[in-house]
C-alpha cells in the first residue's frame, strides 16, 4: 500500500511538472507570436471597435471631471455683462473724485511746476516775438524782390539788343549760301536701309519746320548732355525780416546710370518712324507744288486749328489762375499780420 501511494504521488508530481513546462512553453510562444503579429494582415482585426473603446474610456473620464457653473453668468444683469474700462475700474476702487495720477504718479510733481514756471512771462515773451516781424518789413522785402527782378529783365533785354546789332554788323562767314536757305542733313534708317539726305530748303518752308520739330527732342538731349554737371546751385534770396541777402546752396541730384546711358544713346544715328517719314515727304510735296498758302487759307476753320486755339486759351486761363492765387495768398498773409497787431 505504501508503495502504491508513493508511485501515485510521484505520478502526480510528474504531471504537475509537465503542466508547468507546457505553460512556460505556451507563454514563450505567445510572446513570439505577439512580436510577429501585424494588425493589418489580420482579417479579424477591426480598428473601429478599438476607436469606440477609446471613446467610451474618454467619455467615462469626462464624466468624472467637474462641470463649470454658469449660473452666475445667466443670472447676471446687462450692466454686469459689460466690459469695464480702466477708468471705470479705477473709480470703483478709489472713488469717483480720484484721478489716474493716484495709480501712476509722474516723475515731476504739480506743485513744483506751478512754483518754478511763470506762465505770464512766457506768454508775454511769445507775444513780443510775434510782433517783431511787422507787415511793413514784409512789404519792403517784396518790393525789393520785385525791383531786382525788373532790373534783371531790363539788363537781359539790353544784352539781347546789343548782340543782335553786333551780329548784323559782322559779315557772314559763308557767302555761298542764301541767308533764307537752310541746309538739312539727315541720316536715318527706313525699311531696314540707311538713307542719307542733304538738301537746301527755305527757312520758312513746311519741310524745314517739320524737320526741326522732328529733331527737337534729339537736339535738346544733346545740349543737356554737353552742359557741365555741378554738385550744387547757388541762389541768393532775402529772408523776410532781414535786409541782407543770403546765399543758399541747393544740392543737385547725382545723375544715375540710366541718365548716363540715355545721354550716350542720343549720339547714335537718328531713326525716323513711318509717321515722321511720311510727314517729311508730305512737307516736301507741299513745297514743290506751292500749296502752302492754299492749305493755310482752307485749314483756318479745321479741327487742328480749333484745337490749337483752345490750347492757347487754356494756357492763358492757367496763367490768370496762378496770378490770382498768388495775390490771394499775399492778401491773407497781410491780413494775418494786421490781426496779430
Curated annotation (Swiss-Prot):
GO cellular component, one term: Swr1 complex
GO BP annotations listed: chromatin organization
Record's keyword terms, sorted: Activator, Chromatin regulator, Nucleus, Transcription, Transcription regulation
Membrane spanning stretches: none
Record field: compositional bias (Polar residues): 69-78, 152-170
Renumbered residue ranges of the record's region Disordered: 1-104, 125-180, 316-341
Domain BCNT-C, chain residue ranges per copy: 252-331
Compositional bias annotation for Basic and acidic residues: 13-32, 134-151, 316-331
Function text: Component of the SWR1 complex which mediates the ATP-dependent exchange of histone H2A for the H2A variant HZT1 leading to transcriptional regulation of selected genes by chromatin remodeling. Involved in chromosome stability.
Record-stated family: Belongs to the SWC5 family.
Protein name (Swiss-Prot/TrEMBL): SWR1-complex protein 5
Native organism: Debaryomyces hansenii (strain ATCC 36239 / CBS 767 / BCRC 21394 / JCM 1990 / NBRC 0083 / IGC 2968)
Amino acid at each position: 500500500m505504501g508503495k502504491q501511494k508513493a508511485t501515485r504521488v510521484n505520478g502526480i508530481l510528474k504531471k504537475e511538472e509537465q503542466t508547468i513546462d507546457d505553460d512556460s512553453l505556451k507563454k514563450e510562444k505567445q510572446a513570439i507570436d505577439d512580436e510577429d503579429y501585424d494588425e493589418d494582415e489580420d482579417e479579424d482585426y477591426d480598428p473601429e471597435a478599438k476607436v469606440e473603446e477609446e471613446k467610451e474610456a474618454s467619455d467615462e473620464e469626462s464624466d468624472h471631471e467637474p462641470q463649470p457653473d454658469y449660473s452666475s453668468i445667466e443670472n447676471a444683469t446687462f450692466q454686469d455683462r459689460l466690459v469695464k474700462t480702466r477708468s471705470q475700474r479705477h473709480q470703483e476702487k478709489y472713488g469717483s473724485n480720484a484721478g489716474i495720477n493716484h495709480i501712476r504718479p509722474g516723475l515731476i510733481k504739480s506743485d513744483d511746476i506751478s512754483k518754478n514756471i511763470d506762465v505770464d512771462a512766457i506768454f508775454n515773451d511769445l507775444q513780443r516775438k510775434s510782433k517783431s516781424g511787422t507787415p511793413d518789413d514784409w512789404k519792403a522785402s517784396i518790393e525789393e524782390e520785385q525791383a531786382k527782378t525788373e532790373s534783371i529783365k531790363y539788363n537781359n533785354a539790353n544784352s539781347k539788343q546789343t548782340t543782335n546789332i553786333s551780329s548784323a554788323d559782322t559779315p557772314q562767314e559763308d557767302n555761298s549760301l542764301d541767308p533764307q536757305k537752310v541746309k538739312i542733313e539727315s541720316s536715318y534708317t527706313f525699311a531696314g536701309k540707311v538713307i542719307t539726305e542733304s538738301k537746301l530748303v527755305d527757312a520758312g518752308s513746311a519741310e524745314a519746320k517739320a524737320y526741326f520739330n522732328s529733331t527737337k527732342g534729339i537736339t535738346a538731349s544733346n545740349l543737356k548732355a554737353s552742359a557741365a554737371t555741378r554738385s550744387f546751385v547757388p541762389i541768393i534770396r532775402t529772408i523776410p525780416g532781414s535786409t541782407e541777402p543770403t546765399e543758399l546752396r541747393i544740392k543737385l541730384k547725382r545723375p544715375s546710370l540710366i541718365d548716363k546711358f540715355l545721354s550716350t544713346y542720343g549720339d547714335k544715328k537718328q531713326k525716323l518712324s513711318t509717321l515722321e517719314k511720311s510727314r517729311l515727304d508730305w512737307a516736301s510735296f507741299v513745297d514743290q507744288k506751292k500749296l502752302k498758302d492754299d492749305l493755310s487759307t482752307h485749314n483756318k476753320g479745321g479741327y487742328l486749328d480749333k484745337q490749337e486755339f483752345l490750347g492757347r486759351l487754356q494756357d492763358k486761363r492757367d496763367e490768370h489762375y496762378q496770378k490770382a492765387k498768388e495775390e490771394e495768398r499775399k492778401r491773407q498773409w497781410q491780413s494775418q499780420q494786421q490781426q496779430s497787431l
